[in-house]
UniProtKB/Swiss-Prot annotation:
Family to which the UniProt record says this protein belongs: Belongs to the complex I 49 kDa subunit family.
Function of the molecule: NDH-1 shuttles electrons from NADH, via FMN and iron-sulfur (Fe-S) centers, to quinones in the respiratory chain. The immediate electron acceptor for the enzyme in this species is believed to be ubiquinone. Couples the redox reaction to proton translocation (for every two electrons transferred, four hydrogen ions are translocated across the cytoplasmic membrane), and thus conserves the redox energy in a proton gradient.
Assembly behavior: NDH-1 is composed of 14 different subunits. Subunits NuoB, C, D, E, F, and G constitute the peripheral sector of the complex.
InterPro entries: NADH_Q_OxRdtase_suD, NDH1_su_D/H, NiFe-Hase_large
Record membrane topology: Peripheral membrane protein
Source taxonomy: Bacteria, Pseudomonadati, Campylobacterota, Epsilonproteobacteria, Campylobacterales
Gene expressing this chain: nuoD
GO MF annotation list: NAD binding; NADH:ubiquinone reductase (non-electrogenic) activity; quinone binding
Protein's UniProt name: NADH-quinone oxidoreductase subunit D
Species of origin: Campylobacter jejuni subsp. jejuni serotype O:2 (strain ATCC 700819 / NCTC 11168)
């Protein structure tokens, strides 16, 4: 039985001339190069794309609505499932928004640990991007080498929080644990080893004729386009705009560490690749400085504020007031004052921010996530026009989107 509906199929909304040279094809939603459930409706004239329409929603889970029915602490693990390649970035952006709403200031050691987790996660995210992007173009060796190095970083993250992908390592007011014994030594050993691995990647790709042909003058994004479409991160910096939220609006202790903001002016896929490669090196600089900062901090890893943050386990087990306050926080949630905040952060893919409107209860009245992949995916509508079908997959891989944060 056919269900009557006024909604037309996607392809009927795309007007095109009925010519022999024109055709419409679907790329996805089940396609290995889509890196998720993304559907692109492409109108082709021969092999050239004349219209493109990204269709999303296949992974939609209603996360923003879920947040309205959870206490503030309860939503932290859900943020892991947005950009699941960079879970710590999501954890931090959400916790920072709640902390700003509550007026919480986290201890210095907690800030350093957060920075370490964020930069390690940035490296794993960039490694996965390089591995899959190279594989899409046919560079199998780079894929294997990137995954080899990524294992070292995932082992470091796992040693801290017990998880490799969905970390849930941060808490409102600080972090879950102090760094384990010998953690900094292992991290610094990786920082010493990794530059040689980066050189291996560049030796394989920089002078590779196929890699250059598939990335140079492909997927060109001008400054005006990047700004008009809300591009951030490497998509913006690869087009000549030197903008990094860690520099422009410093958070945690980024204003105390020295690092550069890599950028390029060509705006093509190869320029963005070079920016990514330099960002690896800047993250290593930050990690080395964090190791020095950590040694000069006191051992507190959670803010002291009974209204918003639970006491230590020892206090909960020995003090009636701490036990009662902990019970209230776990069952009813912390209750920020009425108001609204937006906190932007620099995730591996661009600007990741959370807007929260509080009505004074233990649950957000409204939560909105600003995720970079959503804006970059929308840009395909203009970015892919004029390119060849063979380059579509290469451009999609270069833009570095993840469907988990598009379909929230």
């Amino acid at each position: 039985m056919q269900i009557p509906s006024k909604l037309k199929p996607y392809y009927e909304n795309i007007a095109f001339e009925q010519e022999d040279s024109k055709m419409i094809i679907n790329l996805g939603p089940q396609h290995p190069s889509a890196h998720g459930n993304l559907r692109l409706i492409l109108e082709l004239d021969g092999e050239q794309v004349v219209k493109a329409r990204p269709c999303i929603g296949y992974m939609h889970r209603g996360m923003e609505k879920m947040a309205e029915n959870m206490i503030y602490q309860e939503f932290i693990p859900t943020t892991d499932r947005m950009d699941y390649i960079a879970a710590s970035a999501n954890n931090y952006a959400y916790c920072a928004a709640v902390e700003k709403l509550c007026g919480l200031e986290i201890p210095r050691r907690a800030a350093v640990i957060r920075m370490i987790l964020l930069e390690l996660n940035r490296i794993t995210s960039h490694l996965l991007w390089l591995a899959t992007h190279a594989l899409d173009i046919g560079a199998m060796s780079v894929f294997l080498y990137c995954f080899r190095e990524r294992e070292y970083v995932l082992d470091l993250i796992e040693k801290y929080c017990g998880a490799r992908l969905t970390h849930s390592s941060m808490r409102i007011g600080g972090v879950m644990l102090d760094l384990p014994e010998n953690y900094l030594e292992e991290m610094l050993a990786f920082c010493d080893k990794f530059p040689n691995d980066l050189k291996d990647y560049e030796d394989l790709l920089d002078d590779n004729r196929i890699w250059r042909l598939r990335t140079e003058n492909v997927g060109v994004v001008t400054k005006e386009q990047a700004l008009n479409w809300g591009c951030t991160g490497v998509m913006l910096r690869g087009s000549g705009i030197k903008y990094d939220i860690r520099k422009e609006e410093p958070y945690l202790l980024y204003n105390e560490v020295e690092f550069g903001v890599p950028y390029a002016t060509q705006g093509d896929s190869y320029a963005r690749y070079k920016v990514y490669m330099q960002e690896f090196r800047e993250s290593l600089k930050i990690l080395r400085q964090c190791a020095m900062l950590y040694k000069d901090t006191s051992p507190e890893i959670l803010a002291t504020h009974p209204e918003y943050v639970s006491a230590s386990k020892e206090q909960i087990l020995t003090q009636n007031y701490s036990l009662m306050q902990h019970f209230v926080l776990i069952t009813q949630g912390l209750k920020p004052p009425k108001g609204e905040v937006y906190v932007p952060t620099e995730s591996p893919k661009g600007e990741l921010g959370f807007f929260i409107h509080s009505d004074g209860t233990g649950r957000p009245y409204r939560l909105k996530a600003r995720t970079p992949s959503y804006w970059h995916c929308a840009f395909f509508e203009e970015m892919l026009v004029g390119t060849y079908l063979a380059d579509v997959v290469a451009i999609m891989g270069n833009v570095n989107i993840v469907l988990g944060e598009i379909d929230r």
